[in-house]
Design a protein with these regions (language model features):
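Secretory targeting signals
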Residues: 1-3
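FAD-dinucleotide binding site
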Residues: 5-462
């Protein structure tokens, strides 16, 4: 049976309304039409797309839970928090918003803007304006380099006269945006990233949403794929639980996992693909979670705070999450990577030190329970979001190219929504469509339906 895209979209609507079933712990199936490696946003999107056509799919996930880099922690503190991806974007076109509501979850606008701390005081209005002006100038310089197709580092094209605001601007555009310092980030990649100002939050957690959306999919958790044998006709996926024969496979693992060799390919995948993945290495971005009862910092619900800094040893705070006493200190880039390597104790010490610097030792002493993510040490992810190195922006398109009956998905394959769960989701749907076409299960209607990234183009900054 071949289904048209229009018929598929109707089936997708039915699938979204189906009762949610928990991922099966049944024995691993020995065959499927399409196997999906990874149960993050891209893998779940691909699986749902395939299920809507009535084709047989199996999702193979190395970790013991659904989510990938979207994990909501509901047990460490009284308040749930996202250990990884936190926001969605593009509310007018993002299908995940509708799916969240259909799943009974609450979506709401994320906090906009941030407060600036200068030493132990809040920035004055004029100082905030100066910072925003510096940020706009820095961003504009990167955009101009991108439009001129100068794929050098973002740092190399920055204005030289940002003064006291250079450190904060570089943090917000580099480590705080992509998990990499600007000297390690491609100007074209940064310039092509769609604006992400209209952020949307899921009150129950983005990880909770991905888990709910994946509960219908046939799932093998705690089952790392060790080898993929592929050709132009079929594939086989080897795991510790057995081998799966399929007509196609969609690989959604992170670029760092792909180049690590954790999954062997027979025959080897082309050097061109691995080179592309290596130029899209994951940045470092972690959260240090602190319980601060009594609001000793005097901040409001969901306040976002940064500091005027002349050093990369800095952070971003997301305070009083959801009106609770839980605060997140986010660190990234080279400093964040080095700090994470030192372990959770060192990360908590830095968070207390940072709070003491900005609010005083009494505020820092109010910290009670702490916890920290260490995504670089996660064996099934090995980092945060992909970020192209200088000269590497074209690698996203290369990485998305199918190889025989092997298809790749994940945020790293999206040219404008990279580093976002939205980009991961859309890439999974695209890869599923391509795989379904390859096996003859999907035929496009003459008038194709645009995706969220083609419905609304990014307007150039003025």
């Amino acid at each position: 049976m071949t289904i048209t895209r229009r018929g598929f979209l109707s089936a997708s609507a039915v699938l979204a309304a189906m009762p949610v079933l928990r991922a099966s712990a049944a024995p691993l199936p020995r065959e499927a039409d399409i196997a999906v490696i990874g149960a993050g946003a891209a893998g779940i999107a691909a699986a749902r797309r395939i299920m809507a056509t009535g084709r047989k799919v199996i999702v193979v996930e190395a970790a013991p839970q659904i989510g990938g880099r979207c994990i909501t922690d509901s047990t460490t503190f009284d308040t749930p928090f996202d250990r990884g991806a936190r926001w969605m974007h593009n509310p007018d076109t993002n299908p995940m918003i509708r799916l969240a509501r259909s799943a009974g979850l609450d979506v709401l606008p994320a906090p906009s803007g941030q407060k600036m701390r200068i030493g132990r005081r809040n920035a004055r209005a004029g100082e905030t304006e100066q910072f925003l002006a510096a940020l706009v100038r820095a961003n504009r310089a990167i955009d101009e380099a991108a439009r001129a197709k100068l794929d050098s580092s973002c740092a190399s094209v920055l204005p030289k006269d940002l003064g006291d605001w250079a450190g904060a601007a570089e943090f917000m555009l580099g480590a705080g945006f992509a998990g990499k310092d600007l000297k390690e980030l491609s100007a074209i990649d940064k310039g092509r990233a769609q604006d992400r100002n209209a952020a949307i939050a899921c009150r129950q957690g983005l990880g909770t949403l991905i888990t709910k959306l994946g509960e219908q999919a046939p799932m093998a958790l705690s089952t790392p794929a060790s080898r993929i044998a592929w050709s132009n006709r079929d594939v086989s996926v080897e795991t510790q639980a057995g081998k799966i024969a399929a007509r196609a496979v969609i690989v959604t693992v992170s670029t760092n996992v792909l180049i690590s060799g954790a999954i062997k390919f027979t025959p080897d995948i082309p050097k061109r693909t691995l080179d592309a993945a290596s130029k899209l290495g994951l940045g470092s971005y972690d959260r240090i979670m602190l319980q601060l009862p009594g609001n000793p910092l005097g901040l409001s619900r969901d306040d976002i705070l940064i500091e005027q800094s002349n050093s990369t040893r800095t952070a971003l705070m997301f305070a009083n999450i959801g009106g609770s006493s839980l605060c997140s200190i986010d660190v990234g880039g080279a400093f964040g990577r080095d700090l994470s390597e030192q372990g959770e104790k060192a990360m908590a010490s830095f968070a207390r030190e940072w709070i003491a610097k900005l609010f005083g030792s009494e505020a820092a002493s109010a910290v009670q329970k702490t916890s920290a993510t260490r995504w670089n040490a996660s064996p099934f992810v090995m980092g945060a979001m992909s970020a192209a190195s200088p000269g590497g922006q074209l690698s996203r398109r290369v990485l998305a190219e199918p190889i025989g009956n092997v298809f790749f998905a994940g945020e790293a394959t999206h040219e404008t929504l990279w580093g976002t769960v939205d980009g991961a989701w859309e890439s999974g749907e695209r890869a599923a469509d391509a795989a379904l076409r390859k096996i003859g299960a999907l035929k496009d209607d003459p008038a194709d339906v645009p995706t969220q990234s083609t419905k609304k183009r990014r307007a150039p900054r003025q």
